[in-house]
Amino acid sequence: MEIRNAIVDAMFCIIYKKKALTWKTGIERRTECNLPTSNMAAQRRNLMQSHQSWTDDLPLCQLCGVGTAPNCMYGTDGKDTQSHPNEDTHLRFRSEDGCSLYGVFNGYDGSRVASFASQCLTAELLLEQLSADHSDTDVRRILTQAFEAVEKSYLHTIDDALAEKANLSGYMLPHSEKVQERLKELEQEVSGGATAIVALILNNKLYVANVGTNRALLCKTTTDGQNQFFQLGRPHNTDNDDELKRLAALGLDSARVRQAGQIAGQSSTRRLGDYRVKINYNDIDLLSAGKTRPIIAEPEIHGSQSLDSVTGFLLLMSEGLIDALECAHGPEHVNKEIVAMVAAELAQQTTLEAAAQSVVDRVKRLHHDVYTSGRQRATFCSRHEDMTLLVRTLNYPLADGVLTPTQAGGRIYPVSVPYSNSQSTSKTSVTLSLVMPSQSTLTNGTNTASTLEEGTPTPGGWSRCRRRRNFWTRQPCI
């Protein structure tokens, strides 16, 4: 337990020593790094504010590509302006022992928590904590403990700032200009949170850990020749019945929570950081009746799922990407559209990075085109948040001129993808030549493409779209 509590300290030692090959006890680590115990929290805070990361020296997975786009809001002329610094981050590492770790972190009120979580979680999972002889139960336990350590470590980094904030709030001259300025600085230092979707591949088995409202999709070609896609888990939000039951068991009024749609400005019922709903949850009306902390950082873990003989790809998506496509086309077919776009780009691009980025760029264009179309849905597309898409291929070839999906025995399939034309008044479709790596059809779960995601339900349908974005539009999505 002492070693687990000091894991983050080791991570910061790695920063200053550049390379750390073995774990030592907490005292040894502090001695080696010449960092006194009392100074550890300050060092953590300094690192969180810098661009330096010990993970910069880790090997990236070459079977993975990432596409990103910053948040933006559109002006009346259709031009976009970034409204705040990027808050998303991601990780994609592959250790020498064959363990691969991927993640997409969606930050809010700053990128501090997302950046901290991505670094700390990597230290918790890729420095020899996992081995090939671990059982599924062991891996799930280690994943859960890793998120717990990240949460505790982050909250520890803001202890001093929270104490100073509490002290100044009770100051005899609280309205002093200097006091108010310092309180504002402290609030900026401690505020913020993040949601996370993390995938781990060990022994060619897939494990997915989710905290919040990001999404994971697995697309694979089955033995009967069908390409199926599955949503791995459901979002932890105010439309998730299981989450509402969990909150009700803690004493909360689940009906009020569902009706509110958001808790402290976010729809997620699980999140990392965000001291307001963790340390000060009793001060929030919706949460004040809770017997314990209602908003938690415990991940929901899916797996293991064997990847032996699997051909396809894994997608990790930030909430911003999902929201942008939902606002443009509605939530019913988002998974199908994303899978079709990724498959089409993999058949055309020569690098995974280019394929992932092309999909994100396309979603951004679709969102923008709906806004400039002047149609009814334009009202709900006036802005979008940061977007991140991580694509990890599973024996899936690229169009690299050497081995393309068609050369590998695949066929070309027409796939209808909704497309918004600024000159029209309704959503139309265009047909893509979708190249799949085998003779198959695109399906969802065990259903064909015509079933339109019956196997991956979207909780709450349009109501979820409305509640998640009511702080933008104050109107229902239709």
Summary of predicted features, one role per range:
Residues 1-478:
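PP2C/PPM-type serine/threonine phosphatase catalytic domain
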